[in-house]
Amino acid sequence: MAPETKSLLCDVKNSCLMIVDVQEKLSAVMPEKVINRLKTNTDVLLTAANQLKIPVIATMQYPKGLGGIENFVKDKLNETSKCFEKTSFSSLEAEGLEDHLKELDKKQIILMGLESHICVLQTAIEFTEKGYDVFVVSDAIASRKLTSYETALTRLEQAGVWLLNTESVLFEWLRDASHPNFKALAKLIL
């Protein structure tokens, strides 16, 4: 059973990185600048998660219509990563996902993906309601329209979800410059 205490910092031993619906047809309708930022930050977060042995979960919203997971995500998933298909907007409703999380025994959900105001928002709120510590990586989520993105951030804060950026996640996971992975991971952003 995951600990009941609420941590205000991302904890490498208690985190699970969840990539929500970064799929071909959703990415294709994002502004170029936005999708480039998402690609860069996805690379940083997945590289760090893999090096630090943080479990990774990816979800796909109705892949028949929205396509598969983008290659820039798929190429970084490892043999321990799990992918779940869903039709519900909240990833929590994907068949088997909640059971998998219970097996992992992680209390913190670090969320990134598409779209900010729909699937990321509903996933974050439902996980918060279930008692998880939810951190949304604000520079690793996106919406087609800026107003949708901004409204999602406001709503997430109102719901008690922690907002942070990619660098914050990375350095909270590392906690100290003496961490054995510090030099390799710091190169990703410096």
Regions found by a protein language model. Give the residues of each.
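Catalytic-site beta-strand/loop segments enriched in glycine and acidic/polar residues
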Residues: S15, V20-Q23
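Short acidic, Gly/Ser-rich segments with clustered Asp/Glu that frequently serve as metal-coordination loops
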Residues: E24-V29
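A short alpha/beta connector and helix-capping loop motif
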Residues: N14-S15, P31-I57
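Short beta-strand segments at enzyme active-site cores
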Residues: I19-V20, P55-Q61
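Active-site-adjacent betaalpha module
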Residues: A2-C16, K64-L190
